[in-house]
Curated annotation (Swiss-Prot):
Cross-referenced PROSITE patterns: PH_DOMAIN (PS50003), RHOGAP (PS50238)
Protein name: GTPase-activating protein BEM3
Taxonomic lineage from the root: Eukaryota, Fungi, Dikarya, Ascomycota, Saccharomycotina
Protein source organism: Eremothecium gossypii (strain ATCC 10895 / CBS 109.51 / FGSC 9923 / NRRL Y-1056)
Rho-GAP domain: residues covered: 799-1013
Site (Arginine finger): residue numbering on this chain: R836
Major localisation: cytoplasm
Spans annotated as Disordered: 90-197, 258-277, 282-301, 307-421, 702-726
Cellular compartments annotated: Cytoplasm
Gene Ontology cellular component annotations, sorted alphabetically: cell cortex; cell tip; cellular bud tip; incipient cellular bud site; mating projection tip; plasma membrane; site of polarized growth
Molecular-function GO term, any one: GTPase activator activity
C-alpha cells in the first residue's frame, strides 16, 4: 500500500510539473504574440508594408505576369495565322444597343480586373456540344434560336462578359480536329474588348527618382506605380476603362462565296476562321480551376478578398453594390475578303444580334463612343470598297458613324494612334515637355558594378536649373536611338555621334571630345523642339529608362572617376588609366574595379595645374599634378598626373586636395632668418627641405608687408599699341655692339663662325664708335620718358616700377621675383622639360600685359581669381602652370634691351674666356673677381644671382626634369643673347663666383653648336 501511494504521489507530481510547463509555454506564446502585435501595430506606419501585404502584392504581380505571357502567346499565334492566309480582309461590324435603365446598371470593372475578382483565368471556348451550366449560358432570343446557327459558349466568370461565337451549319465540315485547336487566354479577349493593359496613358509622371536610403513605406507606395503596363490613370483620362461605353467590338467569321478556304487544299484553316477557335475537351479541362493546388486556391482566395475590398472601396463608396444586368448585343462577323485591298469596313448589322453582355455604368455627359478594332492588328480602318458592296449596303449609316468614331477617338488605346504608344513605359518627362529640359552628359567614364553602361546623363530643368534625375546608357543603346531618330527625321540636321573607337581610348583629349559631341547631339535634338511625335516619344522613353540613383554621400571628402598616369609613363599616350579615386582623411585611394591600386599621402604634397593646350603631346585636358612627398626627401617624391572630365570637376578636386596638402606655403615650418643664412644660398644643404625653394626669403607672408617700389607718378605714360613697343625694342637692340662686331676666331669657338662675333676687343675703334653711337641714339630717342612698361625696359627702370628683396641682400624686379616664387613653390625645378616646353601663348601674353600695367602680379594666387563664364569651361589658357610661368620669365629676359650683366661688362667676360682657354678653374676665379670688383652694377649682379641659382637647381634635378647643363645652355644662350662659353661657367661654378667657394677642378665640357650665336 505504501508503494502504491508513493507511486500515486510521484505520478501526481510529474503531472503537475507538466501542467506548469505547459502553462509557462502558453504564457510565453501569449506574450510573444502580444509583443509581435505591438511591434506591428506600433511600427507599421514607419516600417513599411506588412508581410501579408507583400505576399498579396507578390501574388498580384505573378498573376499579371502570367496573364501577359498568355496574351503574348495568343498574339504570336494570331500573327502566324494572319501571315499564313493573307487572302482575307477584315470587316468589323458593330451593333448599337439601347442603353439599359440606370437602376439596373452596374459599374463594371475592366475585363482584367473582373477576372481578378473571381480568381479565374479560363476564358477558353468549349467545343461544340459541350454542356455548359445554365448560369454561364447567354440568353438567346427566339429569333436567334430559330436561326439555325450552332452556338459555342465562351466560359467566363459570372462577373465577366458572356459571349457566344456563332457559325453557320455549312461550316461544320471545316471543324478542326482537337489536335489543331488553339488555346486562347482571357487576356487575348481582354485586348479585343478593351484591355486596360493597352490603354495606359501616363499623362503625368508618377514615378520619382528616390534615394535608396528612404523608408520602405515610401517604396511600397511607389511599387504599384512602377509596374510596367498595368498602371491606369483613371482621373479625367479620355480612355479610362471606367468610362467604356455600352458599345463593344464583336467578331463573326463569314466566308464569302468563292473565297471559302478549303482546309484539305490549304493544309489548315484560314486566319480567324471558325476552325481556328475550336477547342478540344482536353484544352477545356486543362484550364479548370479544380486543377489548382490547395495552396494556390488559398492564395487566390486571399487575393480575391483583397481585390473585392479594394474595388468596392474605390468604385462603390456607399458600400452598396448594384446587381449586374445584361444587355443584348451581337457578334460581329469577320469576312474573308481579298487581301490585296487591305481594307476593312466598320458596319452595323441589325440582324446579327446574338447575345447579351454586362456593360459599365457611366455618366452620360462623359461617355465616349468605343473605338474600332485595333488597326494595327486587323488592318487600317476605311470604308468598304467595291468588293465589299454587300456589307456596305447592309449598314451604310453605321459606316458614317464608325468613321466619325474613329476620327474623334484616335486617342483610344485600341486605335493606331500616337497617344496609344505612351502606354509602353512610365515616362519621367512627357514628349510635349521636352522643351522644358536639357540633357547634359556628366561622364563618359561612369562605371557601376553589374551595369555595362558607361555614359552618365543628367536631365536638368531649364527654368530652375536643377537636376531632375540621372540615367545611364551604353554607346550601343545610344547608337540604336540615333538610328531611329535619323529614320524618322531625315529632313532635319542632326549632328553625328562620336565614333565608336573614341570610347576605346582613355586619352583625356578624346574623352573630352566624345563628351562634347554627345552634348552637342542631344542639345541639337532639344533645340529642334517641338519634335515630330515619334522621335519625341522615343526620346522621352530613352531618358525615362535606366535611371541612376544618387549615391549616399558623406563617407568620403571627395570621390569620382579620374584619368591617372605616373611620370615614368610619360613617353606613351596609351598609359592613361581610369581610376575611381576617393579622399578619406589625409589619404587618397585609387581603385581599379574595387581593388585599391595606389595610396597617396596628401600631407606635405603639392599640387600643380596644367594648362589645356591643343597641341599637348600627352593629350592632357583639365589636368593637375599631385607630387607625393616622401620622408627621404624631394628627390624621391612620386608625381601623379590626373585629368578630370570637366574644368568644374577639376576645380572641385583642387579645392578639396589643397585643404589637405601641407606643401610649401602651407603649414610646413619655415626656417628663421639670420645673418649667416642671408649670406648663403638655400641649396648649400645636402637635400631639399620642405620649405620654400626661395630659402630665407620664403617667408612670403612677412615680406608681403613690404610694399613694392612704385614710381612717384601715379599715371605713367604707356605706349598706345603693342606694335610700337616692339618697334622701339628692336631699335634699341640694333645699337648694341655684339650685333655688329667683326668675326674673329676664339679658342672656344674655333670652327664656329656663328660664335666668333664676340672676339672683338673693347679697345677697338669699332667698339668705341658703336658705344658713342649708342649713347647718342638713346639720348635722342628719349625712351625713358615714354617707356614705362616692365617688358622691354632696362633693369634700372624696371626696378623703379616694382621690385622685391631676394635673399635679404638683393633687389630684383617683381616679375622675376614672382616667377621664381611660383616655380619654387610648385616644384617647378622638377617639372619635366621646364624652360623647354612652352606654356599657353595667350596666357603668357595676358600676363605680360598685366605686368606692364600693374607692375606686380601675384602668380601663386592667380588661379584662385580666375572666373570662368558659362560655355567657356573648356577654353585653354585660363590657369597658370609651370610651363606658362617659365615662358613668362624667358620672355622678360629676351626683351631686356641689354645683357644680363650689362653691355659694358660683356667685353671683360669675353677677354677672360679667351685668355684662359680651357682652364675652367681660372675662368671661374677671374669671373668672381670681376663680379666683386664693383665694375658691374649691383642690380645686374642681383639678377645674375637669382637666375643662375635657379639654373643650378634645375641641373641638380636633371634626372627628374630631363634638363641637363647642355639643354639649359641650348635654351638660355639665345634667350640671354650671350655665347655658351660665357654662360657655361656661371652655371657650373656658381658657388665659386657668387658664394666664395672653391672652384671646380674639371668642369663638364659642353660642346654645342647654336646657329645665331
Amino acid at each position: 500500500m505504501g508503494d502504491g501511494s508513493d507511486a500515486e504521489r510521484s505520478g501526481g507530481t510529474s503531472s503537475s510539473s507538466a501542467l506548469e510547463l505547459l502553462a509557462q509555454y502558453e504564457q510565453h506564446i501569449m506574450e510573444r504574440g502580444r509583443t509581435l502585435e505591438a511591434i506591428e501595430g506600433h511600427g507599421g506606419e514607419r516600417l513599411g508594408p506588412t508581410y501579408e501585404e507583400l505576399v498579396e502584392e507578390n501574388v498580384q504581380l505573378r498573376r499579371e505576369l502570367q496573364g501577359q505571357r498568355e496574351e503574348i502567346e495568343h498574339l504570336r499565334k494570331t500573327i502566324s495565322l494572319l501571315a499564313s492566309g493573307r487572302s482575307g480582309a477584315t470587316v468589323v461590324e458593330q451593333q448599337v444597343r439601347p442603353e439599359p435603365s440606370p437602376s439596373v446598371r452596374e459599374l463594371a470593372l475592366p475585363p482584367r480586373s473582373a477576372d481578378r475578382r473571381k480568381n479565374t483565368k479560363n476564358l477558353s471556348l468549349a467545343p461544340v456540344g459541350h454542356e455548359v451550366p445554365s448560369t454561364d449560358r447567354l440568353r438567346v432570343s427566339p429569333q436567334e434560336a430559330t436561326s439555325g446557327a450552332q452556338q459555342v459558349p465562351l466560359l467566363t466568370s459570372s462577373k465577366s462578359a458572356e459571349i457566344l461565337v456563332s457559325k453557320s451549319p455549312d461550316e461544320d465540315r471545316h471543324l478542326m480536329s482537337p489536335r489543331k485547336t488553339i488555346s486562347r487566354s482571357s487576356s487575348s479577349y481582354s485586348n479585343t474588348l478593351g484591355s486596360p493593359a493597352t490603354s495606359v496613358l501616363y499623362k503625368n509622371s508618377r514615378i520619382s527618382i528616390t534615394s535608396p536610403c528612404k523608408s520602405n513605406s515610401t517604396s511600397k507606395a511607389a511599387s504599384v506605380l512602377s509596374l510596367p503596363e498595368n498602371n491606369t490613370s483613371t482621373e479625367n483620362a479620355p480612355h479610362s476603362p471606367h468610362r467604356i461605353d455600352n458599345e463593344l467590338d464583336l467578331l463573326t467569321v463569314e466566308p464569302q462565296d468563292g473565297s471559302r478556304y478549303d482546309t484539305e487544299r490549304a493544309g489548315g484553316p484560314g486566319p480567324l476562321s471558325p476552325e481556328s477557335i475550336v477547342y478540344s475537351d482536353s484544352d477545356l479541362q486543362e484550364h479548370q480551376p479544380s486543377d489548382l493546388s490547395s495552396t494556390t486556391r488559398t492564395d487566390l482566395g486571399k487575393f480575391r478578398d483583397m481585390v473585392d475590398t479594394t474595388f468596392n472601396a474605390e468604385d462603390n463608396p456607399t458600400g452598396s453594390r448594384d446587381k449586374e444586368t445584361g444587355t443584348e448585343m451581337e457578334i460581329a462577323t469577320l469576312q474573308n475578303t481579298p487581301s490585296r485591298q487591305h481594307e476593312s469596313s466598320l458596319v452595323t448589322s441589325p440582324q446579327a444580334s446574338r447575345s447579351s453582355i454586362t456593360t459599365p455604368v457611366v455618366d452620360p455627359t462623359n461617355t465616349s463612343e468605343p473605338s474600332s478594332l485595333s488597326a494595327a492588328k486587323f488592318g487600317s480602318m476605311s470604308t468598304a470598297t467595291s468588293s465589299n458592296k454587300r456589307s456596305k449596303g447592309m449598314g451604310t449609316p453605321s459606316v458614317e458613324h464608325s468613321a466619325k468614331s474613329y476620327s474623334q477617338h484616335s486617342g483610344s488605346p485600341h486605335s493606331n494612334s500616337h497617344q496609344s504608344k505612351k502606354a509602353d513605359i512610365p515616362l519621367f518627362v512627357q514628349p510635349e515637355e521636352l522643351g522644358t529640359i536639357r540633357i547634359e552628359v556628366i561622364s563618359t567614364l561612369y562605371h557601376e558594378p553589374g551595369n555595362a553602361a558607361s555614359i552618365l546623363f543628367s536631365v536638368v530643368d531649364k527654368k530652375s536649373s536643377k537636376e531632375m534625375f540621372k540615367f545611364a546608357k551604353t554607346f550601343t543603346r545610344i547608337a540604336e536611338f540615333d538610328t531611329f531618330i535619323r529614320n524618322n527625321m531625315e529632313s532635319l540636321a542632326v549632328p553625328p555621334l562620336p565614333d565608336k573607337h573614341m570610347f576605346a581610348s582613355n586619352v583625356p583629349v578624346k574623352v573630352d571630345s566624345r563628351r562634347e559631341k554627345l552634348n552637342d547631339y542631344f542639345a541639337s535634338l532639344l533645340y529642334l523642339s517641338p519634335l515630330p511625335f515619334n522621335p519625341a516619344l522615343k526620346l522621352a522613353q530613352f531618358i525615362s529608362t535606366d535611371p541612376v540613383m544618387n549615391p549616399i554621400t558623406g563617407e568620403f571628402a571627395k570621390e569620382g572617376m579620374l584619368l591617372v598616369r605616373k611620370s615614368k609613363t610619360l613617353g606613351s599616350t596609351t598609359t592613361w588609366r581610369i581610376r575611381y579615386c576617393t579622399v578619406e582623411g589625409s589619404i587618397m585611394h585609387l581603385h581599379d574595379h574595387m581593388i585599391d591600386t595606389d595610396t597617396i599621402k596628401l600631407t606635405h604634397s603639392t599640387i600643380e595645374l596644367q594648362a589645356n593646350l591643343p597641341d599637348d603631346k600627352y593629350g592632357t585636358k583639365n589636368g593637375f599634378i599631385l607630387n607625393e612627398h616622401k620622408k627621404s626627401g624631394l628627390s624621391s617624391s612620386t608625381k601623379y598626373y590626373f585629368c578630370a572630365e570637366t574644368p568644374k570637376e577639376r576645380e572641385q578636386w583642387i579645392s578639396v586636395l589643397t585643404t589637405l596638402c601641407d606643401g610649401p606655403g602651407g603649414t610646413a615650418a619655415i626656417p628663421s632668418i639670420n645673418s649667416k643664412s642671408e649670406a648663403s644660398s638655400l641649396f648649400e644643404q645636402t637635400s631639399i627641405s620642405d620649405s620654400s625653394y626661395l630659402g630665407p626669403i620664403a617667408n612670403l607672408e612677412a615680406m608681403d608687408a613690404t610694399s613694392p617700389t612704385r614710381p612717384n607718378d601715379p599715371n605713367p605714360v604707356s605706349l598706345t599699341s603693342e606694335e610700337e613697343k616692339e618697334v622701339k625694342r628692336r631699335r634699341m637692340k640694333s645699337f648694341f655692339p655684339f650685333k655688329k662686331l667683326a668675326t674673329t676666331p676664339t679658342p672656344y669657338a674655333a670652327g664656329n663662325d656663328n660664335a666668333s662675333i664676340f672676339s672683338q676687343d673693347d679697345d677697338s675703334p669699332v667698339n668705341a664708335t658703336n658705344e658713342s653711337g649708342i649713347s647718342r641714339s638713346l639720348q635722342s630717342m628719349n625712351l625713358q620718358a615714354q617707356y614705362n612698361a616692365v617688358f622691354g625696359a632696362d633693369l634700372r627702370s624696371c626696378l623703379q616700377l616694382s621690385s622685391h628683396p631676394y635673399q635679404g641682400k638683393y633687389e630684383i624686379p617683381s616679375v622675376v621675383f614672382r616667377t621664381l616664387e611660383f616655380l619654387y613653390k610648385n616644384r617647378g625645378i622638377q617639372e619635366e622639360g621646364i624652360f623647354r616646353l612652352s606654356g599657353s601663348s595667350s596666357l603668357i601674353k595676358s600676363l605680360q600685359e598685366q605686368f606692364d600695367k600693374e607692375y606686380d602680379v601675384d602668380l601663386c594666387n592667380y588661379n584662385d581669381k580666375v572666373s570662368v563664364t558659362p560655355g567657356n569651361e573648356n577654353q585653354g589658357g585660363l590657369y597658370v602652370d609651370v610651363n606658362t610661368v617659365s615662358g613668362l620669365l624667358k620672355l622678360y629676359l629676351r626683351k631686356l634691351p641689354h645683357m644680363i650683366f650689362g653691355d659694358a661688362a660683356y667685353m671683360d667676360f669675353k677677354r677672360i674666356v679667351e685668355r684662359n682657354g680651357d682652364d675652367s678653374k681660372l675662368i671661374a676665379l677671374e669671373f668672381r673677381a670681376l663680379v666683386n670688383s664693383g665694375r658691374i652694377a649691383k642690380e645686374y649682379v642681383a639678377l645674375m644671382y637669382a637666375l643662375f641659382e635657379l639654373l643650378v637647381k634645375i641641373t641638380e634635378n636633371s634626372k627628374y626634369n630631363k634638363m641637363n647643363l647642355r639643354n639649359l645652355c641650348i635654351v638660355f644662350s639665345p634667350t640671354l643673347n650671350i655665347p655658351v662659353n660665357i654662360l657655361h661657367p656661371f652655371i657650373t661654378d656658381f658657388g665659386c663666383i657668387f658664394q666664395d667657394k672653391a672652384p671646380m677642378e674639371n668642369g663638364p665640357p659642353v660642346n654645342i653648336h647654336i646657329p645665331q650665336i
